[in-house]
């Protein structure tokens, strides 16, 4: 898995109704923009605010609309291992390519507990697994040695890092050099170009919901070592980060930015789940 894999916004009509038509427009917009995969129900997709019914519908409708054109990754993060397994089973039944899992986020586990959690979870999942490092939201970060331990299972195939810590990301890349097949993906788009230049496999970049071709061009330039093109594109990406993502005064500001921009592009409504209204 490599390239630009947007973390899809979940188009909503209300707190428990999926905007299926908006989702279809969004997926077609992304495919036309040349992205390399689709990632649903992550942070940008408001997963933790959505009912299980709505999460399951999002999996089914995304896979139906995509119809095998791109790999689909499904986030199964939950405080309940039973619900994580159930989402993975639905994803497999619908034709998804893999699942993505951040640590359980209520009782923060220590590193031994974290490794044991995944050593229990991964064998019960029907799809390949990407680990998801999101310390700002789940209160714990995967130590590089923990990533290496968990990845002894070959069904753990990649790592998405949203820490925005370049030194940490390089440390994980270093310990995982024994697995050249292990996909290293970065979340923050502001640092995707430099990460790819240093050997990362791609980005799960929210801005690609709005401007997929921009992020694909950035990835291609970084992959090719085209610094002149990157010097032109990186300021545009930073302008998006420092304007669209600053709507409101809270941690969900970037999400509100997406949901303000996508209606302007004619893609979906601006409904944000009640948990993020303010």
Q: Where would I find each of the regions flagged by the language model?
A:
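Structural recognition of alpha->loop->beta junctions
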Residues: 93-99, 124-127, 149-158, 269-270
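Short, flexible micro-motifs
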Residues: 6, 40, 45-48, 78, ...
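C-terminal alpha-helical cap/extension of soluble enzyme domains
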Residues: 5-9, 33-35, 200, 211-278
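A general structural signal for well-ordered alpha-helical segments in protein cores
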Residues: 23, 55, 59, 84, ...
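Active-site beta->alpha loop and helix N-cap motifs at the rims of alpha/beta catalytic domains
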Residues: 1-6, 10-141, 277
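Catalytic alpha/beta core domains of metabolic enzymes, predominantly
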Residues: 123-124, 135-241
């Amino acid at each position: 898995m490599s390239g630009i894999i947007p973390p899809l916004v979940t188009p909503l009509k209300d707190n428990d109704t999926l905007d299926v038509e908006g989702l279809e427009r969004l997926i077609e917009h992304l495919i036309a923009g040349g992205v390399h995969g689709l990632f649903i129900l992550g942070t940008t997709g408001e997963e933790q605010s959505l009912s299980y019914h709505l999460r399951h519908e999002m999996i089914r409708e995304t896979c139906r609309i995509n119809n095998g054109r791109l790999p689909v990754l499904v986030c199964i993060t939950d405080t309940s291992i039973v619900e994580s397994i159930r989402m993975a089973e639905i994803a497999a039944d619908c034709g998804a390519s893999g699942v993505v899992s951040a640590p359980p986020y209520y009782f923060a586990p220590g590193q031994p507990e974290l490794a044991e959690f995944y050593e229990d979870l991964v064998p019960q999942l029907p799809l390949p697994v990407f680990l998801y490092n999101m310390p700002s939201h789940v209160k714990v970060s995967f130590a590089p040695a923990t990533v290496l331990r968990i990845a002894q299972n070959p069904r753990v195939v990649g790592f998405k890092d949203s820490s925005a810590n370049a030194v940490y990301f390089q440390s994980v890349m270093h310990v995982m050099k024994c697995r050249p097949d292990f996909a290293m993906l970065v979340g923050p788009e502001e640092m995707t170009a430099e990460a790819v230049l240093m050997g990362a496999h791609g980005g799960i970049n929210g801005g690609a919901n709005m401007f997929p071709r921009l992020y694909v061009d950035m990835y291609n330039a970084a992959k090719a070592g085209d610094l002149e093109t990157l010097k032109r594109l990186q300021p545009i990406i930073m302008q998006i980060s420092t304007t669209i993502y600053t709507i409101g005064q809270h941690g969900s500001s970037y999400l509100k930015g997406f949901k303000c921009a996508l209606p302007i592009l004619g893609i979906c409504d601006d409904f944000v789940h009640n948990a993020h209204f303010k």
